[in-house]
Amino acid sequence: GESYDCEIAVERVLEGVQGLINKSQGFNIDKILFCIGNDILHIDNVYGQTTKGTHQDTDGKWWEHYEIALMLYVKCVEMLRYIAPVDVIHSMSNHDYQSGFHLAHTLKSWFRKADDVRFDISVAHRKYYVYGENFIGLEHGDGAKMDNLPLLMAQEQPEMWAKTKYRYFYLHHIHHKVKHKWLDAKDYIGVTVEYMRSPSSADSWHSRKGF
């Protein structure tokens, strides 16, 4: 299979962040939403298992993963805050439910004196964010069914829904990319629900399944 380790993972993330920064040049960027979580640690205990006990292929030790992920997040936030103030939102994930939560809080502590970095790292499974007329929902993708997300969005945050025109829900649970479109009863307000692809290579399970 494809060669992949922590060093390659870090390189891909930093390359992706720098690529987005490069593409944003020429625009008046006044706010950046940085989404973290989504199984970055991949495992949730010292035995190389997920929160529910499923063994995973990993490179290195559990504590190395934590240290590497923390410093990667710090580097990303530092890169982004040079451009504009950063809002960090953490998505609770099924592989590293507890350790990912701890990692997010450690990152918040790192930037505790930074007035240009804000955090939403609660245990809530779905997080919501408004920028101008844009309403953004975030979830790992292992919770509510995809078909239910648009109505959940309206029900859970009616005020945010009412004051926005453009609505998006981003999920991260699968490797391949899927996009659906929902319209309200009058067919004029759209909600786009999209799965974002992982920058990681497929492990043995995903490789066998063809992801």
Positions of PLM-derived features:
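Core catalytic region of metal-dependent phosphoesterases/phosphodiesterases
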Residues: 2-117
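Conserved beta-sheet core of the metallophosphoesterase superfamily
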Residues: 107-118, 123, 132-137, 142-211
